[in-house]
């Protein structure tokens, strides 16, 4: 499939590369065409700028996402981000990724960021496969990459690309106050749970994914907090005989895509109506029960976090991210919900005359803010 001075890349199937190339051939466009290969972890204003600059130089531009799931955001999320971020271009097609371009098979050093003789061999293999198979299948004459002033490995890859594929064009990275806009800076902000800082450099259509990421991260942090007497933690079931750490973790993963959808609803100039929020919430609840085979692991958390996700996404869209506006949005959303009847929680509220999850939301969580 590919070769470098010190290695060859082979596969034991006649369908793998051929199948992917047939897929790429089905996407071919007339005129001068080019391609951008990106990880998009997550899709930033810098990625959008690269696509914008590249698309202006060709009749049609293809964007291929790195398929390997070794990133903060999953491949499917990154693919969705790229499609949303590139939707405003008439001459851009976002393509499915494959194991044949910047993957653990062709270029594993990319994911550990260590430059070595082995890494150079891997880069040459990856680029040889691109030049021999992927570029001809798409019919592209140019490959566009962003300049890389700080990452030695990626910079070396770009320089080798210029040698292997003459149609390589390096585009200067977008900067903000002399600082290069990078996905790594966004990830650093997310690692420190700095929402506003993270959203500063992501493209607007990426914001819902950032909000959802932090919502899911919060649920995982709560689960991993150990010990928690009476509650499920990493070492104990607590008072819950029908659930454990693994089941709770599975439930959180099942809920995550719905946090993206809820944040997308909220990321608009007006708050979404309650019925739309309820519909997504009901789908999320169904997915949770499917993942846990009927165990209620996060129904309450889904309600509270779901409302918060919508409110925070709306605050980011309207540039009103502060405690008072977010509380206002939470209360406004909660007021559209009616009290449940016929549940254990509803019976407890009736007997003991205490406030439940909905009442706390309507009051914008006074115990938290």
Q: Which role does the model predict for each range below?
A:
Residues 2, 54-56, 61, 309-323:
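Compositionally biased, low-complexity linear motifs
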Residues 257-310:
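Long, hydrophobic/aromatic-enriched structural stretches that serve as scaffold segments
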Residues 207-270, 274, 312-369:
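Phosphate-rich cofactor/ligand-interacting catalytic cores and adjacent structured alpha/beta frameworks
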Residues 111, 307, 346-350:
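Acidic/polar active-site rim loop that often engages polyanionic ligands
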């Amino acid at each position: 499939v590919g070769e470098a001075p010190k290695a060859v890349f082979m596969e034991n199937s006649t369908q793998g590369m051929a199948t992917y190339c047939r897929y790429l051939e089905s996407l071919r466009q007339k005129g001068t065409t080019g391609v951008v290969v990106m990880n998009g972890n997550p899709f930033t204003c810098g990625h959008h700028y690269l696509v914008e600059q590249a698309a202006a130089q060709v009749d049609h531009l293809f964007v291929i996402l790195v398929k390997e799931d070794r990133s903060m955001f999953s491949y499917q999320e990154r693919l969705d981000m790229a499609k949303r971020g590139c939707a405003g271009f008439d001459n851009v097609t976002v393509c499915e990724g494959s194991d044949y371009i910047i993957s653990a098979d062709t270029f594993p050093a990319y994911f550990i960021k260590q430059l070595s003789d082995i890494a150079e061999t891997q880069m040459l293999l990856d680029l040889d496969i691109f030049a021999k198979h992927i570029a001809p299948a798409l019919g592209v004459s140019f490959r566009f990459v962003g300049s890389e002033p700080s990452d030695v490995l990626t910079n070396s890859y770009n320089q080798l690309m210029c040698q292997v594929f003459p149609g390589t064009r390096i585009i200067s990275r977008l900067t903000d106050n002399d600082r290069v806009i990078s996905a790594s800076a966004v990830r650093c902000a997310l690692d420190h749970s700095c929402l506003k800082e993270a959203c500063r450099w992501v493209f607007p259509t990426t914001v819902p994914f950032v909000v959802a990421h932090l919502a899911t991260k919060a649920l995982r942090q709560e689960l991993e907090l150990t010990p928690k007497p009476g509650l499920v933690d990493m070492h104990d079931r607590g008072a819950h005989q029908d659930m454990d750490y693994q089941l709770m973790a599975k439930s959180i993963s099942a809920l995550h895509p719905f946090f993206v959808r809820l944040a997308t609803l909220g990321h608009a100039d007006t708050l979404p109506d309650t019925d739309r929020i309820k519909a997504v919430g009901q789908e999320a609840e169904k997915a949770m029960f499917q993942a846990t085979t009927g165990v209620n692991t996060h129904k309450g958390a889904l309600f509270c976090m779901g409302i918060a996700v919508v409110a925070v996404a709306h605050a980011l869209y309207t540039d009103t991210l502060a405690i008072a506006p977010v509380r206002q949005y939470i209360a406004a959303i909660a007021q559209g919900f009616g009290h449940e009847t016929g549940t254990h929680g509803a019976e407890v509220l009736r007997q003991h005359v205490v406030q439940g999850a909905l009442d706390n939301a309507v009051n914008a969580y006074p115990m938290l803010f």
